Amino acid sequence: DRKPKQLSGGQQQRIGVARALAANPKVMLLDEPFGAVDAITRLQLQNELQKIHKELGDKTFVLVTHDINEAFKLGTRVLVMDKGKICQFDAPREIMRNPKTEFVANLIATVKEQEAFWSELK
């Protein structure tokens, strides 16, 4: 019985995805869908989206994000752009193993640096 503005960011995101799915589209565009929520809610929403994608195998999700970790986690194919130009379009594993441009290599280096940081904390 709450008004939309009284819902948390995560609740609003879930409702937005549910409303879009109710129209039964073949393709869904998600533009920074988890950008305005805390890290815990973001992870929950990412996991829920993965589950939905598996359950509704006939759907294509186009996810726009500035978070390379999110793109690699959720994407079966990832398109990396720099200044409006396509740098690479591949599976996440291929991008990690074989970056095609200096920009992509630098992006991958940030992922590896973050991994090293978290490893050091253990």
Model regions and ranges:
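ABC family nucleotide-binding domain
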Residues: 1-41, 52, 56
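Conserved ABC ATPase nucleotide-binding domain signature region
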Residues: 4-5, 92, 104
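Conserved catalytic loops of ABC-family nucleotide-binding domains
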Residues: 45-63
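A short, surface-exposed alpha-helical micro-motif characterized by mixed small hydrophobic
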Residues: 71-73
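ABC ATPase "signature
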Residues: 89-90, 98
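C-terminal boundary and immediately downstream tail of ABC-type ATPase nucleotide-binding domains
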Residues: 97-122
